[in-house]
Amino acid sequence: MEKLTEQQKLEQRRLGPVNKAAFRFMVGLATVLFKKKYGVSFTYADDIRPYRGKPYIVVSNHASRVDYVFTAPAFWPDTFNFVVGYNEFFRSHLAGVLRAMQTVPKKNFVQQPYAIRQMIRIIRGGG
């Protein structure tokens, strides 16, 4: 049998909502490690409390490879799946974490039905 490429492995994954305990642990760890270092603070333009625990989609501006440091704590304690650039799955120090956190790989600047299908799957699964 032919060995699968990394792209084939990624595209065969069937994603679901992120594990809440693992997500909250990672957010807590990132907060401890990076919040003070990067001076992260939050100012809410809208009251998001009515949305807590309900399904919603977060669309954020791309800041850097550490977007999660700015995005995830702002919505605490809610959890969500990130959509991350496909190329990030080839970084050895990130690949395992991205897979464990049910992160959706998305190729940059192209339409990718796989990513859309996985997002729909996650939403239907309660994520």
What are these regions (language model features)?
Residues 2-46, 92-101:
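A transmembrane-helix-recognition feature enriched in membrane-embedded lipid enzymes
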